[in-house]
Structures are given as C-alpha cells and as structure tokens.
C-alpha cells in the first residue's frame, strides 16, 4: 500500500484531509507539531483523531516557535474577536513552511511520495501560506531539494480542501465519516477543548456547520453570533 504523510493539527480541516487520504488508499502517517501553541488541546484532539481513524503511525514533533515569536498563537498577544484588514496577528511566521518541511523529511525517510495538508484559500483568515501559489511552490521545492526527488521520484503535495468553503468541508467530513466532535479549532480553547465562540476560527467553524445544515458538535463557552441568529 502506498504511504502518505498527513499534517494533523487536531482541527476539523486536518481531520477531513486525513480521512480523504485514507479513502484514496494511502497508508497514513500522521504528523502533528507541538510548536508552542497556546491552544494545546488541539494536539490532544490530534491524538484522538489519529487513534479513531486508526492511522498507520502518528508522530508528534516538538519545534518551539515561541523562541521566534511574532504571533498571537504563541506569544502573550491578545487574540482579537474579529478579523481586521491585512494579515492577522494569529498568523505564525513560516509555520506552514516549517510543518511541510518536517512532513517532507519524514516522507523521504519512510518512502512516501505524497504529503497531505488542510490549507484552505476560501473561508480562511488571510494567511499567505494557505494560498494555492504556496502549495505549488512548495511542491517544486520538494522535488528540487530531496534525494528522492533528484533521483527521479515525483513528490506531490496535496491540499484537497484549498478551494472548498467551510460548509463544503463539513459535507466532505460527513461523507467520509469524520467525527467533528473529536476536533478542536479554537485559538482560545481551554484544556478540555471547549471553544471560546468568539475568535475568527470559531466563527468560521460555526458558520460552516450552519451553512451546511449540519449539527455543530462543538462545545462552545459562548455561542458564536452565527448560531445566535439561527
């Protein structure tokens, strides 16, 4: 069976991508990164998802990006309730580049030619490393900068959700049997995985379920506006 490395954060998008990779016949090696994120319950969710989906392997790698800083997700910077203009303070400098690089390294070691990630360029917060151009550029890098690439193996970086709305992602998850109750998306999630209901991630998630007409299993400490209007 062909192998793939899948970046599994513990959020809903990465859970759906993991299920998609499995449905395509890949033996999934899930990779989660402990980068110093304040919402550590997301990693607990990744462990649960990997176990329930019965992935072939699950590795958690420590890369402490707090030493670099520059993000509200790692530093003592207030996480805003609403997104503003430009790139938000929740952007983590070079995060997706670093994570994909680690996935690339593991893929080369285990003999996998495919990497999956859950980046999205439709209903997203404006992160530059979620754009299709970035995924295309990284795939080019992967084939230029690896032993297997130079020796002729074509490496592929898959982002199957990049052109889907959050509602469409919810439908994909339902189609593939994903238990969204296992996932954590909130930037301010508490240690038990309860979501704040106010941050941009919570609002996007809640709106996705509402637009999809699917019950939202998220445990919110405060109901997002999109749910209060229903």
Swiss-Prot record:
Pathway: Purine metabolism; 7-cyano-7-deazaguanine biosynthesis. InterPro entries: QueC (IPR018317), Rossmann-like_a/b/a_fold (IPR014729). It holds the Pfam family QueC. Gene3D superfamilies: HUPs. ATP binds at residues 8-18. Zn(2+) binds at residues 186, 196, 199, 202. Transmembrane segments: none annotated. Its cofactor is Zn(2+). It is an enzyme of class 6 (ligase). Its EC number is 6.3.4.20. One of its GO terms (molecular function) is ligase activity, forming carbon-nitrogen bonds. It catalyses: 7-carboxy-7-deazaguanine + NH4(+) + ATP = 7-cyano-7-deazaguanine + ADP + phosphate + H2O + H(+). Keywords: ATP-binding, Ligase, Metal-binding, Nucleotide-binding, Queuosine biosynthesis, Zinc. The keyword Ligase applies. Binds 1 zinc ion per subunit. One of its GO terms (biological process) is queuosine biosynthetic process. The keyword Transmembrane does not apply. Catalyzes the ATP-dependent conversion of 7-carboxy-7-deazaguanine (CDG) to 7-cyano-7-deazaguanine (preQ(0)). NCBIfam families: 7-cyano-7-deazaguanine synthase QueC. Belongs to the QueC family. This is 7-cyano-7-deazaguanine synthase.
């Amino acid at each position: 069976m062909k192998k793939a490395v899948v970046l599994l954060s513990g959020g809903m998008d990465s859970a759906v991508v993991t299920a998609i990779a499995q449905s395509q016949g890949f033996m999934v090696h899930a990779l989660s990164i402990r980068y110093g994120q304040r919402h550590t319950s997301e990693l607990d969710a990744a462990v649960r998802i990997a176990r329930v989906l019965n992935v072939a392997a699950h590795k958690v790698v420590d890369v402490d990006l707090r030493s670099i800083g520059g993000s509200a997700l790692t530093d003592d910077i207030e996480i805003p309730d609403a997104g503003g203009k430009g790139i938000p303070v929740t952007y983590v400098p070079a995060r997706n580049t670093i994570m994909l690089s680690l996935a690339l390294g593991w893929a080369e070691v285990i003999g996998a030619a495919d990497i999956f990630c859950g980046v999205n360029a439709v209903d997203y917060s404006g992160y530059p490393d979620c754009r299709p151009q970035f995924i295309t550029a990284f795939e080019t890098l992967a084939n230029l900068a690896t032993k297997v690439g130079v020796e002729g193996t074509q490496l592929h970086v898959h982002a199957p959700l990049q052109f889907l709305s959050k509602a469409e992602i919810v439908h994909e998850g339902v189609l593939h049997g994903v238990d969204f109750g296992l996932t954590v998306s909130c930037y301010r999630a508490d240690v038990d995985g309860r979501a704040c209901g106010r941050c941009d991630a919570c609002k996007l998630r809640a709106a996705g379920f509402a637009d999809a007409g699917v019950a939202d299993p998220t445990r919110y400490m405060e109901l997002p506006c999109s749910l209060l209007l229903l």
